[in-house]
Amino acid sequence: MKFNQILPVIAIYVVALGGCSNTTPDYSEFYKDPETVKEEDPSLNDNQIKVMSFNIRYYNTNDTGDKSWETRTTAFIPMIEDQKPTVIGIQEARPPQLKWLEENWKDYGYIGKGRRANNANNDEFVPIFYRKKAVELVKWDCFWLSETPDVPGSQGWDNTVPRVATWAIFKHIASGKKFFFINTHIDVGSTIAPGKSMEVIVNKMSELNPEGLPMLLTA
């Protein structure tokens, strides 16, 4: 992302699940585009950032074969080393998965809270991972996608579960510029909640970003 008035974003959308007809597939290549598509140069200028949105699929013992967490993680380290995103919005992360990411994405820190009020170990997070050498964390917190967004664990409208959003203000070290970032996971099993959730997010953008910093949203 260049820090201009109108901000084009270098975005990478990664699908965690995948397959291959090869009898011995190289799962570490899951994330790559087909060979017919020219890959982008992962390097960045001093006034750019790279943003990734990544639904890692919550840990589920019923997932087997190439859908299993253990198989899918073989692509996670080479993908990050190859693409070097500045910030990553993660969806569907359970605490054991967060622990794995923290231990293996060593150049990154992360922020986030569980979607329920008690931060239970089987709870889901929508954390933000950030490259520590590229950005400085200025401040962060969470709010909930409900009629009472400042109440931890609150569940609004026809959401099937509580939905949380993680927000942060970062300072880009190379340029000295700050930007505002939100990561969340909109409920797809409801009718009213998606639109109402976006209303909450838009209101929170104004409330939490009074400086009018460049804004980014992953979901």
Could you say what each language-model-derived stretch is?
Residues Q48-T61, V138-F143, K177-D187:
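Active-site-proximal beta-strand elements of phosphoester/diester hydrolases
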Residues L7, L17-N104, R115-D123, E199:
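N-terminal, active-site-proximal structural segment of metallo-dependent hydrolase catalytic domains
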Residues P162-T184, T191-A219:
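His/acidic metal-ligating clusters that form di-metal
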Residues N119-N121, S190-A193:
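Solvent-exposed loop/turn segments connecting transmembrane beta-strands
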Residues M1-P8:
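Bacterial N-terminal signal peptides that target proteins for export
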Residues E29-S43, V87-I182:
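Structured beta-strand-rich core segments of catalytic domains in phosphoester-bond hydrolases
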Residues V14, D46, D82-K84, A134, ...:
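Alpha-helix termination/capping residues and helix-transition junctions
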Residues N62-D66, P85-V87, S154-Q155, H185-T191:
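Second-shell loop/turn segments in exported
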